[in-house]
Amino acid sequence: MVVIRLSRGGSKARPFYNIVAADKRVRRDGSFIERLGFYNPNARGGEEGLRVALDRVNYWKGVGAQASETAERLIKQATQKTAA
């Protein structure tokens, strides 16, 4: 089963997350099928904090992928940002 979830990167005390489509059986930071965007919780000033390829997210959901709660929240946030 394919899931859309966050994969942690960055360094200690400076997290950075990739939003990825991955097989449910693979570990959190392991291999993934496709990178769908990123989330930087420590974005400051003019830095981009969130980017999501909504067309690819819709494709993966269309073929049965399920998003984690946090990924779903970020996707909704990106959708509202795009609509505004």
Curated annotation (Swiss-Prot):
GO cellular component, one term: small ribosomal subunit
Family in the record: Belongs to the bacterial ribosomal protein bS16 family.
Keyword Magnesium: no
GO molecular function: structural constituent of ribosome
Name listed for the protein in its UniProt record: Small ribosomal subunit protein bS16
InterPro entries associated with the record: Ribosomal_bS16 (IPR000307), Ribosomal_bS16_dom_sf (IPR023803)
High-level lineage: Bacteria, Pseudomonadati, Pseudomonadota, Betaproteobacteria, Burkholderiales
Pfam families: Ribosomal_S16
GO terms of biological process kind: translation
